[in-house]
């Protein structure tokens, strides 16, 4: 697996950030060497670093065995902030998707996964 981070000036590709982990994660912020300098803390990035840390911690602590119930709980906020914006600020999650590559299944939540259940999406054929 690889992480790809890019902007209008360059593209960086790196295998997993640590060879001992079996996941990649990304949010609206750069983490790869050579890209971090492009982060702009003057714009609203929708809590990108907090969301990244939630993802990284949850996947690190799980250490494999990633499955649909884990992904559903992760996106619903059971492991920390990810999609649970304060709606009074005008922000919310519009949709979330879980891709199960081993079983060739896609699950979609039409809205914030804390309030909307994931349903299998059969429109895409592997």
Report residues per predicted region.
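C-terminal, well-structured catalytic/ligand-binding subdomain of enzymes
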Residues: 1-126
């Amino acid at each position: 697996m690889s992480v790809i981070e890019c902007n209008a000036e360059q593209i960086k590709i790196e295998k997993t950030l640590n060879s001992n982990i079996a996941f990649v994660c990304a949010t609206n912020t750069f983490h790869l060497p050579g890209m971090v300098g492009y982060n702009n803390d003057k714009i609203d990035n929708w809590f990108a670093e907090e969301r990244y840390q939630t993802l990284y911690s949850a996947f690190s602590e799980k250490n494999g065995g990633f499955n649909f119930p884990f992904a559903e709980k992760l996106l619903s906020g059971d492991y920390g902030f990810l999609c649970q914006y304060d709606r009074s600020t005008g922000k919310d999650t519009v949709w979330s998707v879980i891709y199960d590559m081993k079983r060739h299944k896609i699950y979609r939540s039409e809205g914030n996964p804390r309030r909307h259940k994931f349903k299998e999406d059969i429109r895409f054929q592997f």
